[in-house]
Amino acid sequence: MTTLTASPNRIAQYWALTKPRVTQLAVFCAVIGMFLATPELPSWKIVVAATIGIWLLAGAAFAINCLVEREIDSRMARTARRPMARGEITVPQTLVFSGLIGGAGMWVLYNFVNPLTMWLTFATFVGYAVIYTIILKPATPQNIVIGGLSGAMPPALGWAAVANDLPMQAWILVLIIFIWTPPHFWALALYRRDEYAKSGLPMLPVTHGTEFTQFHIWLYTIALVATTMLPFAVGMSGLIYLVSVAILDIIFVWYAWQVYRHYTDMIARKMFAYSIIYLSLLFAALLVDHYLRF
């Protein structure tokens, strides 16, 4: 039976399939991209339509991820309560749900935004749900690096929605998230390394050890600091962003150094939590600077 029943509990289960907390951060970055794409305020109709369309396709991609990794999720404490890991939603139901919301998202983007945004968002869906989840994640410890582009695309999707174009500035935003992703995710993988070892996924701390992973977190953090200077260097942002990102970077570097030289699971956990705050505040600083630049 593949009927999508509408009881409150069932709705909550389908909502959980979309990984709402992860989706919220992705859509937040997309919305910031919309505002950065124009010196004026973007059309509220475009902002609303693009937000809905991108959210729906992101949710569809995460639902496929939950489907593919349901057995792996059931073996990990962090993910064992996901609906598919608990057998609360079937494979056919998930496929129907993902197809419905993904199709709806494409329809919204094509009809109310522009075809470029629709195709870019669909390509991002394929990149995450297929290339990363099905092909790369179970095959290589560099999965998060190679497959990170799909997760880094939201600001470019937002930019394309408003400008119908992807200039250098949009790709700088993508690059920031692309470089941010490995230290963010590897911090999680470090303190969850035993769970990942049981799952069978070739995560970097499992295949190459904790010290190797700690060192690469440090390397990517240095690269991240350099990358986050680009908006100011190319004239995309001003002093508000520069001061804000300098403070954010100093804290990120401190956490990365602690993970590298004085590792504990607790400091890795704190770095992971901070990395989410870091990205949110960085994009918020870009937005404030965009309209209040001096």
Curated annotation (Swiss-Prot):
Catalysed reactions listed for this entry? heme b + (2E,6E)-farnesyl diphosphate + H2O = Fe(II)-heme o + diphosphate
| Keyword set includes Transferase | yes
Documented EC number(s): 2.5.1.141
Extract the signal peptide range: none
The way it spans or sits in the membrane comes to: Multi-pass membrane protein
Which GO BP terms, alphabetically?
A: heme O biosynthetic process
List cellular component terms (GO): plasma membrane
InterPro entries referenced in this protein's UniProt entry, alphabetically: Protohaem_IX_farnesylTrfase, UbiA_prenyltransferase, UbiA_prenylTrfase_CS, UbiA_sf
In the record, the note on similarity to other proteins reads: Belongs to the UbiA prenyltransferase family. Protoheme IX farnesyltransferase subfamily.
**Database matches in PANTHER family:** 4-HYDROXYBENZOATE SOLANESYLTRANSFERASE, PROTOHEME IX FARNESYLTRANSFERASE, MITOCHONDRIAL
What does it do? Answer: Converts heme B (protoheme IX) to heme O by substitution of the vinyl group on carbon 2 of heme B porphyrin ring with a hydroxyethyl farnesyl side group.
Instruction: Name it.
Output: Protoheme IX farnesyltransferase
Q: Source species, please?
A: Janthinobacterium sp. (strain Marseille) (Minibacterium massiliensis)
The gene name reads ctaB
